Amino acid sequence: MTERRRHAIDLDDFTATEIEEILETAESMREVLSREIKQVPALRGKTVVNMFFEESTRTRISFELAARALSANVVAFTARGSSVEKGESLVDTVRTLQALGADIIVMRHSRSGAPYLVARHFRGALINAGDGRHAHPTQALLDLYTMRSHHGQIRDLNVVIVGDILHSRVVRSNLWGLTRLGARVTLCGPPTLIGPSAFWTATWPTVRIAYDLDPLLAEADVVMALRLQKERMQHGLLPALREYTRIYGLTPERLARLPAHAIVMHPGPMNEGIEIFPEVATSATAVIEEQVTNGVAVRMALLYRMAG
């Protein structure tokens, strides 16, 4: 495995072919999870350390289940109660874990770019479970897997991502995956929550920017709603919540305008009644719980690949 492929920091680390291979492997892992005994010995003898410096439910538990289903030894690391609280640096912590025999580190960190620092000091494989506003590659992979399972392929899909684009690491990783696999992507939201369009089109030239959701619905194959990340916002970026919901919220009325084959997605956690209404989140069009379920198989596939 090349140095670049030794770690999974974002989907720009992978070619379109490699992404497709991960999705194909996830199909096999999904079959494993359908068995009475949901376990294979693929990572027996390997140690996976989950380092989460930021709160998580879906991603953390999903990675734990994925590693255990592959028969790995799983260690849950939290900053609280560790030497990090005594001032130990991130690099020294990683070196300690390496000395203790960690083969794979799964890391979530609030600081964008932190995985790149860790990767320079870890001889094993590093998987980014989300870093600041930068990237969340496994969320993008499970989103791609879910889209493909419903539509057969990613190429030529019309994908609308609506909400807090500016602060979303999910958007950035999805853009790498979706554009590499040939989807047509539109980012939609208030100008203050998208930022300069040139920021996006300079890296992803085929991406469209829109500020009005309603005209996009009739031709959408996928609509992905994003929560408002108020914890990352500066004052003044967000209009009144009621006004935001009126213009950008996925309401039952907007759901009715989607094509019959369209699916509604959300990476979670949801703010119901703001970016998505409960009636939409629980509708037959929504595949939100399916995304969560698919996350285990997709993360199994990536762990298996990174284990070499």
Curated annotation (Swiss-Prot):
EC number(s) per entry: 2.1.3.2
UniProt entry keywords in alphabetical sequence: Pyrimidine biosynthesis, Transferase
InterPro entries for the chain: Asp/Orn_carbamoyltranf_P-bd, Asp/Orn_carbamoylTrfase, Asp/Orn_carbamoylTrfase_sf, Asp_carbamoyltransf, Asp_carbamoyltransf_Asp/Orn-bd
Pathway(s) the chain acts in: Pyrimidine metabolism; UMP biosynthesis via de novo pathway; (S)-dihydroorotate from bicarbonate: step 2/3
Binding site residues for L-aspartate: 86, 169, 227
GO molecular function, one term: aspartate carbamoyltransferase activity
GO biological process: 'de novo' pyrimidine nucleobase biosynthetic process; 'de novo' UMP biosynthetic process; amino acid metabolic process
Single GO cellular component term: cytosol
Residues the record lists as binding carbamoyl phosphate: 58-59, 108, 136, 139, 268-269
Catalytic activity, as annotated: carbamoyl phosphate + L-aspartate = N-carbamoyl-L-aspartate + phosphate + H(+)
Subunit-structure text: Heterododecamer (2C3:3R2) of six catalytic PyrB chains organized as two trimers (C3), and six regulatory PyrI chains organized as three dimers (R2).
Protein family (similarity comment): Belongs to the aspartate/ornithine carbamoyltransferase superfamily. ATCase family.
Summary of the function given for this chain in its UniProt record: Catalyzes the condensation of carbamoyl phosphate and aspartate to form carbamoyl aspartate and inorganic phosphate, the committed step in the de novo pyrimidine nucleotide biosynthesis pathway.
PANTHER family, per database record: ASPARTATE CARBAMOYLTRANSFERASE, ORNITHINE CARBAMOYLTRANSFERASE, MITOCHONDRIAL
Protein name listed in UniProt: Aspartate carbamoyltransferase catalytic subunit
